[in-house]
């Protein structure tokens, strides 16, 4: 039995609230149970120096956690003068995933910067961030089209992500903190709405996992992510 009472493949209740902030071209509050992340997408004219003159755009991302998003207060990374390896890794993961969703040529020489700020953490913050960031990205792209910054829609497909793992010997989907902290295996899966994989990050904490268990986790991830696509599309309709 899972601590939350959920079945093995059951994801937490997910809520996607668009236009959550006033200033950003795209903004979303996404809630996976008690995990809550604000995702904002900012449109900027121009691209990084390494892309200038190539006629294509860029999508980048930053991830962070508020000091009291966790059970005990964390020190702000800005106060220590550098970002942690975890923060940088997750920022790069989100950015890679979002770039896989966009035709950078169709974006023109423009940049979309997506900021994902965790305001409350209960496991699965990076997968919640990716799922919410995609909706914020869509709103930013729609803004660009409405303002004639771009002529065609650069979005190739929607993307979403979910965590899966082995908890007490069973494959489970969308781990919350009590499960994540006690799981034998933790895996994050990012997919497109065409059923293709963008990223699979899996690590055995103590007990190695089998190919059969990996297949079972991927099946749970696919089912959970398909639910998330339905929720994204409902939010955008």
Swiss-Prot record:
Keywords: Nucleotidyltransferase, RNA-binding, rRNA processing, Transferase, tRNA processing, tRNA-binding
Pfam families: RNase_PH, RNase_PH_C
Organism domain of life: Bacteria
A Gene Ontology biological process term: tRNA processing
Positions with a binding annotation for phosphate: 86, 124-126
MF GO annotations: 3'-5'-RNA exonuclease activity; tRNA binding; tRNA nucleotidyltransferase activity
Function: Phosphorolytic 3'-5' exoribonuclease that plays an important role in tRNA 3'-end maturation. Removes nucleotide residues following the 3'-CCA terminus of tRNAs; can also add nucleotides to the ends of RNA molecules by using nucleoside diphosphates as substrates, but this may not be physiologically important. Probably plays a role in initiation of 16S rRNA degradation (leading to ribosome degradation) during starvation.
Quaternary structure and partners: Homohexameric ring arranged as a trimer of dimers.
Family in the record: Belongs to the RNase PH family.
Record's protein name: Ribonuclease PH
């Amino acid at each position: 039995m899972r601590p939350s009472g959920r079945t093995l493949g059951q994801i937490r209740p997910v809520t996607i609230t668009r236009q959550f902030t006033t200033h950003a071209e795209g903004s979303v509050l996404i809630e996976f149970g008690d995990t809550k992340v604000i995702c904002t997408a900012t449109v900027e004219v121009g691209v990084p120096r390494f892309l200038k003159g190539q006629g294509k755009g860029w999508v980048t991302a930053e991830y962070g956690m508020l000091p009291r998003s966790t059970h005990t207060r964390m020190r702000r990374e800005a106060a220590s003068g550098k970002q942690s390896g975890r923060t940088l890794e997750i920022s790069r993961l989100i950015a890679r995933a979002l770039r896989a969703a966009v035709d950078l040529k169709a974006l023109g020489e423009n940049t979309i910067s997506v900021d994902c700020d965790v305001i409350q953490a209960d496991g699965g913050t990076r997968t919640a961030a990716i799922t919410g960031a995609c909706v914020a990205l869509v709103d930013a792209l729609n803004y660009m089209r409405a303002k004639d910054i771009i002529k065609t829609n650069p979005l190739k497909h929607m993307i979403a992500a979910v965590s899966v793992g082995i908890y007490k010997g069973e494959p489970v989907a969308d781990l919350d903190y009590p499960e994540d902290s006690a799981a034998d295996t933790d895996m994050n899966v990012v997919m497109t709405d065409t059923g293709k994989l963008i990223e699979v990050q899996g690590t055995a904490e103590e007990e190695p996992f089998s190919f059969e268990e990996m297949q079972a986790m991927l099946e749970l991830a696919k089912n959970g992510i398909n639910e998330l696509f339905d929720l994204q599309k409902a939010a955008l309709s």
